Design a protein with these regions (language model features):
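Beta-strand-rich binding/interaction modules
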Residues: 88-107
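A short, terminal or domain-edge coil/loop segment
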Residues: 18-23, 104-110
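Loop/helix patches that line or flank the sugar-binding groove of alpha-linked glycan CAZymes
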Residues: 1-79, 85-90
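Generic hydrophobic, helix-prone segments enriched in Leu/Val/Ile
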Residues: 39, 55, 102-104, 108-109
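C-terminal beta-strand-rich structural cap/linker in extracellular carbohydrate-active enzymes
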Residues: 110-125
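A short, polar/charged loop/turn motif at coil->beta-strand junctions and beta-hairpin connectors
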Residues: 63-64, 97-98, 117
Length: 125
């Protein structure tokens, strides 16, 4: 009755979409946001560059109101993080080395310079 959180009336209203968006469904879907965040946490624990690397905003991105792009870099690794904060598809070119690996993304494929609505992707090189 209360989205599985309690047998008692909660002080906060339960979201009306709780039957579709809930932990039980997220655990059953390997592509859910639950597992996406697990992967992010795993990367944070296994890649020191994420917490200790030098931060730098990508040149030319200072005034971009749609895309936030930055690097984290240490002596061994560079991460390029590209985030689209809008509900629009945006085209931007970043100099991603040919040998760069797409480390994580919230889309299943990489469309290079096309950054889809709310897309977040991290390249490692």
């Amino acid at each position: 009755e209360y989205a599985g959180f309690s047998d008692h009336t909660p002080w906060e209203k339960v979201n009306p979409n709780y039957k579709q968006i809930n932990v039980k469904n997220a655990l059953a879907d390997k592509n859910s946001i639950f597992y996406y965040y697990q992967k992010l946490i795993e990367l944070r624990h296994t890649m020191p560059v994420i917490t200790n690397g030098r931060y730098a905003l990508v040149p030319g991105n200072e005034e971009d109101e749609q895309i936030f792009a930055y690097t984290r870099q240490d002596d061994d690794t560079t991460l390029l993080v590209i985030l689209n904060y809008t509900d629009e598809t945006v085209n931007r070119h970043y100099n991603v080395p040919a040998d760069a690996k797409l480390l994580i993304s919230n889309y299943e494929d990489d469309q290079n310079d096309t950054i889809r609505p709310y897309e977040a992707k991290v390249y490692q090189y």
